[in-house]
Regions:
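N-terminal Rossmann-like NAD(P) cofactor-binding subdomain of oxidoreductases
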Residues: 1-184, 219-221, 285-286, 290-296, ...
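Charged docking surfaces used in two-component/phosphorelay signaling
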Residues: 66, 155-332
Length: 332
């Protein structure tokens, strides 16, 4: 299989290369794509140096699959051009997620919706992926009535600029290009992406809209608050879920414990619960602090953590590719 990675020198793109290396997909040719400033640079893939190419050149090479992680503007411009030459596109940006004609996929949740005819498949927002992994299991078990989620998101969710700002502030250096309107070190900023007229941010509304689409519940009652925190990798979520029937904690732990891609870490008496530092570089979604909400009936609180660069982005995209291969093998 001939695979292009658009944005290969960025945070998510570089992790995509790692994930492709780790998994058993056959990669006959790799085309790393970067900005004009990156063309000619080398990236490592399976022990070899591979030159970064320009996107127009790679379109002409007609790869079998293109994994996009270069922002919505790049995806809107170039994804259709790849499709026109027969390439299947898996896009990590927000460009196509809410397009009625495009699938928005988390393989463990709604992988069944993929078909061999899909040409552009959208990869959900990082915070959405880890949330719906858990919501899907609990909706099957108890029926979800309402969800309240607060997210605590690492600076890698903003890209290299966010990482540089945090590192500069921690090192006492001047910030030459700020990713945030306020200092991020020793701070929490309740401002992820732009604010909308309804008072929510785009990030918060992504959680609302994408979750409903993925779960097949267009009228899902979900409200969100998203906060940027001074952590390098890993998004955390405090989630309150109201169910249609009375939950039992043991059945919740059992259901989540059996779910593919979910790891239950819930032993607070021994200080065991999910944390960004223990989820980094792992593909699982970690769940803990599972407890009844004593303020209202039929409700639980829980805590979800995942590596936003892996399951929240790169790994999920590669899993979509693997699922496409199962449904319609691509043989170069």
């Amino acid at each position: 299989m001939r695979i292009a990675v658009i944005g290969a020198t960025g945070l998510v793109g570089s992790v995509m290369l790692k994930v492709l290396e780790e998994r058993e997909l056959q990669v006959d040719e790799l085309f790393p794509v970067g900005s004009e400033a990156s063309i000619g640079k080398k990236v490592k893939f399976r022990g070899k140096d591979v030159s970064v190419l320009g996107v127009a050149q790679v379109v002409s090479l007609k790869p079998d699959v293109a994994l996009f992680s270069a922002g919505a503007d790049v995806s809107r411009e170039w994804a259709p051009k790849f499709v026109a030459v027969g390439t299947k596109v898996i896009d990590n940006s927000s460009a196509w997620r809410m397009d009625a004609d495009k699938k928005l996929v988390v393989p463990e949740v709604n992988g069944h919706v993929l078909t061999r005819d899909d040409r552009i498949i959208a990869n959900p927002n990082c915070s959405t992926i880890q949330l719906v992994m858990v919501l899907k299991e609990l909706h099957e078990l108890l029926g979800i009535k309402r969800v309240v989620v607060s997210t605590y998101q690492s600076v890698t969710g903003t890209g290299s600029k966010g990482v540089r700002q945090l590192e500069s502030e921690r090192n006492g250096e001047a910030v030459t290009e700020a990713a945030y309107p306020h200092p991020i070190d020793k701070n929490c900023i309740p401002h992820c992406d732009d604010f909308l007229e309804n008072g929510y941010t785009k990030e918060e509304m992504k959680l609302v809209n994408e979750s409903g689409k993925i779960l097949g519940i267009p009228d899902l009652k979900l409200t969100a608050t998203s906060v940027r925190i001074p952590v390098s990798v890993g998004h955390s979520e405090s989630v309150n879920i109201e169910f249609q029937r009375t939950p039992e904690l043991n059945e919740i732990r059992l259901k989540l414990g059996k779910a593919v891609g979910i790891s239950v870490v819930d032993d607070p008496t021994n200080n065991l619960y999910p944390m960004p530092v223990t989820s980094e570089a792992k593909d699982a979604v970690f769940v803990g602090r599972i407890r009844l909400d004593e303020s209202q009936p039929n409700s639980v609180n829980l805590w979800i953590v995942a590596d936003n660069l892996r399951k929240g982005a790169a790994t999920n995209a590669v899993q979509i590719l693997e699922l496409l291969q199962e449904k319609s093998p691509i043989n170069s």
